[in-house]
Amino acid sequence: MAQKSKAYRAAAEKIEAGKYYTPTEAVALAKETGSAKFNSTVEVALKLGVDPRKADQMVRGTVILPHGTGKTARVIVFATGPAAEAAIAAGADEVGGSDLIEKVAGGYTDFDSAVSTPELMGQVGRLGKVLGPRGLMPNPKTGTVTPDVAKAVFDIKGGKIEFRVDKHANVHFVVGKAGFTADQLNDNIKVALDEVVRLKPSAAKGRYIQKGAVSTTFGPGIPLDVNAI
């Protein structure tokens, strides 16, 4: 633990007090401060000027990162018949109908994303207590409730990420690994930030993106210049 603390302090010392970095500058610093022992995950966190308690100010979306996340997502699909066959062919990690629903109801959550055909959502809906708190419940708004389950699997495994504002008006998402090139990380961050900006609720007043930071696993947050977003 002491070694981690020492590494954290060493990384934090490279961040200038009171300075706000452009996304490009933050990426360069994140790569420099990321752990050399393993390929750290790079994340972006934003504080939005919205009231998540109001339905017309909810920010939720998906975006396909051009260079992926650096991790192959585990995807399960609730489907039967031809749709199940298509999901298997697309590379889904587990596919099933009532059997898979029962497995998840029993507490199985060893996956990163869940997809369902519309026909099975009546049964999948009862998994809300298991999937809801983990952000894994299939939803038409994020393309995870669809008759074209194969495309959903392709997209998710190809680098599609989901994000949604939490009750404190924060949103965070993975944009890659510290081992990515700076150009790859910059491309991913730009695409993700552009989508967050595009989804600004019309009911939101004042500054939309109030604060932001880029960080690596166990690393300090590098404050973003929100005027550069």
UniProtKB/Swiss-Prot annotation:
Coiled-coil ranges per UniProt: none
Statement: the UniProt record of this protein carries the keyword Nucleotidyltransferase: no
GO molecular function: rRNA binding; structural constituent of ribosome; tRNA binding
Family, per entry: Belongs to the universal ribosomal protein uL1 family.
Record's protein name: Large ribosomal subunit protein uL1
Known partners and oligomeric status: Part of the 50S ribosomal subunit.
Keywords from the UniProt entry: Repressor, Ribonucleoprotein, Ribosomal protein, RNA-binding, rRNA-binding, Translation regulation, tRNA-binding
A GO CC annotation given for this chain: large ribosomal subunit
The protein's role, per its UniProt record: Binds directly to 23S rRNA. The L1 stalk is quite mobile in the ribosome, and is involved in E site tRNA release. Protein L1 is also a translational repressor protein, it controls the translation of the L11 operon by binding to its mRNA.
Swiss-Prot/TrEMBL GO biological process terms: regulation of translation; translation
CDD domains registered for this protein in UniProt: Ribosomal_L1 (cd00403)
NCBIfam families registered for this protein in UniProt: rplA_bact (TIGR01169)
Disulfide bond among keywords: no
